[in-house]
């Protein structure tokens, strides 16, 4: 009798764990800030969270581009960093304007984690800096591409879609350029 009760309890526990574990659910995606977005149209909180993360990410990359312009002597890195800063400043402005238009709060600085990353990277030797900087930007771009695609597939907001599509195209292009640049580092 005890075995049956334990078996039933174990099966119930396993069922609840699998059904409620977001990593096991097939109808969800994790976006940017680690918050889970369930399939379907995003609600206002999800859009606000997406926009806040997109804005902070653009601040992150502008700050990292500024660091590269100070720390690197590699002409390709310097050129890429300038393009990155210009492109993300434009994207940042577009995301901020949309968030403000929707009455959503707008972050005014980068993520705290990025401040720590900037501090760590600034301590790197010049040779190590270029490679570590490229790795960080590639990782950020990969995540950004995933977040943009996820929201693009979920929203029907025409203004948001327009900004996402522009940002997605430029982010993908920069990701590809930076991969090539990193592979050719001395």
Per-segment meaning from a language model:
Residues 15-19:
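C-terminal motif of bacterial Sec signal peptides marking the signal peptidase cleavage site
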Residues 2-7, 20-186:
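His/Met- and acidic-residue-enriched segments that coordinate or traffic transition-metal cofactors
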Residues 7-14:
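Sec-dependent N-terminal signal peptides
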């Amino acid at each position: 009798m005890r075995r049956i009760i334990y078996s039933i309890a174990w099966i119930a526990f396993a069922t609840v764990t699998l059904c409620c574990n977001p990593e096991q659910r097939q109808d969800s995606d994790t976006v940017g800030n680690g918050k889970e977005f369930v399939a379907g149209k995003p609600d206002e909180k999800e859009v606000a969270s997406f926009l806040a993360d997109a804005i902070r990410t653009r601040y992150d990359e502008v700050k990292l581009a500024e660091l590269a312009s100070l720390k690197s002597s590699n002409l390709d890195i310097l050129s890429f960093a300038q393009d990155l800063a210009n492109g993300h400043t434009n994207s940042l402005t577009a995301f901020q304007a949309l968030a403000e238009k929707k009455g959503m709060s707008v972050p005014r600085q980068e993520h705290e984690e990025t401040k720590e990353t900037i501090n760590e990277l600034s301590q790197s030797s010049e040779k190590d800096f270029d490679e570590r900087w490229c790795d960080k930007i590639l990782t950020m771009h990969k995540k950004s591409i995933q977040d943009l695609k996820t929201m693009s597939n979920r929203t029907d907001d025409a203004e948001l879609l327009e900004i996402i599509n522009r940002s997605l195209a430029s982010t993908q292009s920069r990701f590809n350029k930076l991969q090539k640049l990193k592979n050719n580092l001395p």
